[in-house]
Regions:
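Histidine- and aromatic-rich ligand-binding microenvironments
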Residues: 6-7, 22-25, 31-45, 193-197, ...
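Generic alpha-helical secondary structure signal
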Residues: 18, 41-49, 78, 82, ...
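Glycine-rich loop-to-alpha-helix module at the N-terminal edge of alpha/beta enzyme cores
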Residues: 30-119
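Rossmann-like NAD(P) dinucleotide-binding subdomain of oxidoreductase/dehydrogenase enzymes
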Residues: 121-252
């Protein structure tokens, strides 16, 4: 039986004394694989990987980052049937519905391809006597996203392509109920030539989520899910000084 591991620094790390939980096919009730449960230590290793990758990635020219985003879009389009099969197996939606989900996510990837070339600053001369004003946009650093069961590809594609196109590194925490398609997506990012550590993925439940919300080196968090959990994520992350967007109300 296959094991869905974390994705840290371009690999499935070899953590000791790991626990796993079952992943079921909703149509048959059959256990199809197992997923590793992440701990605070796993999150910390992912953050270290992202911090290491950040200087190289954020220092790339906008043109280079844009080309890599276009390559990622091309790979997802070519391999979308592989993603759709995994979505259907673990989520239960039809194959055509899964392809539709991927198509909506690709719209955001396409949008992200142009972002690096629009991160221009502003300059105004003589705003005061012998004073000029200059500003630019700088990436936040390490960001994180916590995504729901119902759209295991579309919602991650709402989050990390925009973040990494802006020069950030990103830690993704998908639902532990259907993580295989998301795990394959992380490998496509590496295939596109985006350096290891720019995108990391941590599996797990509340322990992994709390570690993300409380980690001192994660600057921002995005969440999509139910209203009660959105409220918890917002309050907990804000308590630790993070920028947060928590989209609640998900009910399908």
């Amino acid at each position: 039986m296959s094991l869905v591991d974390h994705f840290i620094n371009g690999n499935g790390p070899n953590f000791k004394n790991i626990s796993t939980t079952a992943i079921y096919n909703p149509a048959s009730g059959e256990e199809v694989s197992r997923v590793v449960s992440g701990t605070a230590n796993c999150v910390d290793e992912a953050v270290k990987s992202s911090l290491k990758a950040f200087p190289e990635w954020s220092g790339m020219t906008p043109l280079v980052r844009s080309r890599k985003m276009f390559k990622l879009k091309e790979i997802i389009e070519k391999r979308q049937n592989e993603l759709a099969k995994l979505i259907t197996l673990e989520h239960g939606k039809t194959f055509d519905d899964a392809l539709g989900e991927i198509a909506r996510g690709l719209e955001v990837v396409e949008f992200s391809c142009g972002i690096p070339n629009h991160l221009a600053g502003n300059f105004t001369s003589n705003v005061g006597r012998s004073i000029d004003s200059w500003s630019d946009y700088q990436p936040m650093g390490v960001c994180a996203g916590i995504t729901p069961f119902n759209f295991p590809i579309m919602v991650p594609l709402w989050m990390f392509p925009v973040a990494i196109a802006c020069g950030n590194c990103f830690i993704l925490k998908p639902s532990e109920r259907d993580p295989s398609s998301t795990r394959l997506l992380t490998e496509m990012v590496l295939e596109a030539g985006i350096p290891a550590g720019v995108l990391n993925m941590i599996n797990g439940g509340k322990e992994a989520v709390d570690a993300i919300l409380q980690h001192k080196d994660i600057s921002g968090v995005s969440f999509v899910g139910s209203t009660p959990i959105a409220h918890y994520v917002y309050c907990e992350a804000a308590k630790y000084g993070k920028k947060v967007q928590a989209m609640g109300g998900a009910k399908n």
